[in-house]
Amino acid sequence: MLQPSNRKYRKDFKGRNRGVASRGNRVSFGEFGLKATECARITARQLEAARRTIARHIKRGGKITIRIFPDKPITKKPLEVRQGKGKGSVEYWVALVQPGRMIFEIEGVDEALAREAFSRAAAKLPLKCLFVKRTVM
């Protein structure tokens, strides 16, 4: 699973996930992409499950690029522990995703296969996604 190797501080503030993606919103590395259409927190486990689904569907065909990274720690206190006594320990890692953000990209496969692979991967993610093609400018 993806997580940062080292950080200056172990725990983050809760924060808010608002706005639209101004960066990482175009297909850059592949021919087809899976684009987010709403805000969400995607966990490292969800990302890995979606990646495995894509890899299993396209077999040895193409190259998968993951465009997001789970770099935000989410903390949790143990069950049946009273409030107070400091912040809980890091439970898992998430990537904050805004609408328009590219999540995965594929190259080296035909469109029908890529569309089906992304459709299966989108079912593993907690947000609505859109299949997009690279536009040449």
Curated annotation (Swiss-Prot):
The keyword Cytoplasm does not apply. PANTHER family: 50S/60S RIBOSOMAL PROTEIN L16, LARGE RIBOSOMAL SUBUNIT PROTEIN UL16M. Residues 1-20 are annotated as: Disordered. Belongs to the universal ribosomal protein uL16 family. One of its GO terms (molecular function) is tRNA binding. One of its GO terms (cellular component) is cytosolic large ribosomal subunit. It comes from Coxiella burnetii (strain RSA 493 / Nine Mile phase I). The lineage of its organism: Bacteria, Pseudomonadati, Pseudomonadota, Gammaproteobacteria, Legionellales. This is Large ribosomal subunit protein uL16. Part of the 50S ribosomal subunit. Binds 23S rRNA and is also seen to make contacts with the A and possibly P site tRNAs. CDD domains: Ribosomal_L16_L10e (cd01433). SUPFAM superfamilies: Ribosomal protein L16p/L10e (SSF54686). Residues 7-17 have a biased composition (Basic residues).
